[in-house]
């Protein structure tokens, strides 16, 4: 039986790789690296560095080009599903053509495979006989709260994890809202009683951290995001919106 490992590698710092993740890399015979283009070479470079550090020879690396997603399509969900299906075809070809029976393949997944990642959903579309295992990693959310030295949860309060697109459509539906990838800077629509903890390129040398009342730091975040995207050609950011308790606009209490 062919076997596939989905290995969470953390938010960007090589030190985010867990002991379990390092052992999983050492157990793999073949690695699939999905290239997102020249602008994101550093994403591929980190994966290669981790394989070189923890892989056991002889191993092979197979490369494939990530399919383009139509970001201008009016039907957002349909566009994402189409892109995911084409991603699934890449994985299916890798399993069929590059793995021999009894071999173990590996995908090194940014962050944690179980949070805001399409790999598991893509694997569900594959019609092939194989086993797979998920190795958890440090997510961008965990990295964000650690870097800002703030707890994700507060006593007796829910946390809502959403996207920038949904935040713009629905507004803040909880006192604590985590937003993944927000190209439109939808946090500007939060009320003046919200505090924001924002981070981009978490765990990398390019890491940017900004926090403060939304009304005071929104402009700084917009400017930093635009400059970083222009300089690098891409950006991955995450933030926590936290409503301050009555009489406290800092939003930093955890109890």
Predicted features by range, described:
Residues 3-7, 101-107, 132, 175-179, ...:
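Generic beta-sheet signal
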Residues 25-29, 130, 174-175, 193:
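Short, well-ordered alpha-helix to beta-strand connector turns
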Residues 1-67, 169, 210-211, 218-219, ...:
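Glycine-rich, flexible N-terminal cofactor/catalytic loop recognition
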Residues 170-255:
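A contiguous loop/helix-start segment that scaffolds small-molecule binding in enzyme catalytic cores
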Residues 79-90, 151-163, 216-230:
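A polyampholytic, Gly/Pro-enriched intrinsically disordered region
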Residues 111-175, 230-233, 247:
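Class I SAM-dependent methyltransferase SAM-binding "motif I" and its flanking Rossmann-like core
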């Amino acid at each position: 039986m062919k076997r596939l490992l989905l290995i969470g590698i953390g938010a960007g710092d090589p030190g985010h790789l867990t002991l379990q993740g390092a052992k999983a890399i050492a157990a793999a015979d073949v690695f699939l690296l999905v290239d997102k283009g020249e602008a994101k070479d550093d994403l591929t470079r980190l994966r290669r560095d981790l394989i070189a550090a923890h892989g056991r020879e002889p191993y092979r690396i197979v490369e494939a080009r990530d399919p383009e997603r139509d970001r201008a399509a009016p039907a957002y969900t349909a566009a994402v599903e189409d892109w995911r299906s084409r991603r699934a075809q890449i994985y299916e070809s890798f399993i069929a053509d590059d793995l021999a029976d009894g071999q173990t393949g590996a995908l090194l997944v940014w962050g944690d495979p179980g949070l805001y990642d399409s790999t598991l959903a893509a694997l569900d579309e594959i019609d092939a006989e194989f086993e797979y295992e998920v190795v958890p990693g440090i997510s961008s959310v965990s990295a964000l709260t650690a870097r800002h030295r703030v707890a994700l949860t507060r006593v007796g309060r829910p946390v809502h994890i959403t996207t920038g697109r949904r935040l713009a459509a629905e507004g803040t539906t909880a006192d604590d809202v985590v937003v993944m990838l927000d190209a439109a800077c939808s946090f500007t629509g939060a009320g003046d009683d919200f505090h924001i903890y924002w981070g981009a390129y978490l765990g990398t040398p390019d890491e940017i951290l900004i926090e403060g009342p939304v009304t005071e730091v929104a402009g700084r975040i917009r400017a930093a995001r635009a400059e970083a995207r222009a300089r690098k050609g891409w950006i991955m950011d995450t933030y926590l919106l936290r409503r301050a308790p009555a009489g406290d606009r800092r939003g930093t209490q955890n109890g």
